[in-house]
Regions:
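Hydrophobic, well-ordered beta-alpha structural blocks that scaffold small-molecule cofactor pockets
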Residues: 1-102
């Protein structure tokens, strides 16, 4: 549904969260024919790694993926609020440019 509606016409997805939820979400996106351009995470051990072929970046690098659609896939309490604040401060609009799925 997400690929056919909100993310339609965008250059792939940017998944916030390189943990179990984000990885599972990305696998399903790929099964459905979508592409994940990058993962965004705060964990320095994950940054610069690759997951399912996509790089893991720090939130400060999000502007490079402005043409993608961001999806917050983090289950940690408070993460959704933090991700929303980060994206909105960078000029992204909820629903138009990003949604939370976890």
């Amino acid at each position: 549904y997400l690929l056919e509606t909100l993310a339609r016409g965008r250059d792939g997805l940017v998944v916030w969260g390189a943990g179990p939820i984000g990885k599972a979400f990305a696998r399903e996106v790929q099964v459905q024919g979508g592409s994940v351009r990058a993962f965004v995470d705060l964990d320095p051990r994950k940054i610069d790694q690759r997951i399912h072929g996509a790089p893991v970046i720090h939130p400060s690098g999000i502007d490079e993926y402005r043409d993608g659609f961001s999806v917050a896939a983090v289950g940690q309490e408070g993460a959704r609020r933090q991700i929303r604040a980060e994206l909105e401060s960078a000029g992204w609009e909820e629903v138009t440019d990003f949604v939370a799925v976890a």
